[in-house]
Amino acid sequence: YHFIERPLRSAAPLLRLAPAKVLAMALPLVALCGAGAWATVEYHAQVSLSVTRDGYAWQARRYPAWRPLEPVSAPVLEGRRLFVAGDSHAAAYRTMTSMVARQTGMEVRQQDRGGCSFVNLLRASPADCQGFIEDALSTIEREARPGDIVLLAALRMPELRGFDWQRQDAQEIHQQLLAERTPANAQAARDEAERVLARLQRLGVRVVIDAPLPLFKAGAYRCSDWFNRHNPACAGGLSMPRADLDRLRAPQMALLAELAAQYPSLTVWDPLPLLCGPQTCSAVEEGEPLFFDNDHLSGHGNRMLLPSFRQTLIDIASEKEL
């Protein structure tokens, strides 16, 4: 304002120029600024100083068609369809599911909506998600063939966002979160899971539910750079004791075990041991992000889980039909 805007407003030579000449001088400057803004976005990885500049590592996008990917011999999967349905955590698996499709010859059908989970194991899904859930199930019922596989992905852990981790005791917060899974909520979660699984089992498809993944008090993308080190939003840190996560997911794991015993079509896939050490789970491991934010996988995290997920699909497809 003081060094550019005000001097330009009072510059006598400019005031004496015809408006057309001023416009002719301004247009190249506007074009230059626009080109600079475009280049900043288009070449973010080259010009950014942030450790998050590598979109391939951080973003959970569909695997690029131009990027080479070694095929895998999995004839039992070739031609089958993989239906992926759920909330934003279903979308966060896109790197992994697109890679497994290219490697094995599967066809992926994706339906996701943020905040609308399938079988979240915590409570009933929100009322405004029922239309999406019914639409997704109807699509699967209409298009799936016996032997196809359905991945139901969701946030199945109580969220750790929004707490003041500097002032509040972590164990008290964890106890508060566990208390939110009241008997009524637990029963509603079970009822919804049974309704969904019963409908899918009648189709002759196989169902995969991902067990509750790690989650964190701060988001890796926001809190990995040195200049955010003192941001209050990053105070919770990018690691969690594994014992705390096991405690937070214990009720959901117990329900999953009961559902798996009740529905032979259900397979529980648990990525947590692949993402955590014996004592600690970290959002960033050896400089590589496993998670993008508090609870969504990164592109690198997807690639870490790919071999396990692919083998799970092969094992399912190799079993005798139900």
Regions found by a protein language model. Give the residues of each.
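Extracellular/periplasmic envelope-modification machinery, especially enzymes
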Residues: 2, 6-322
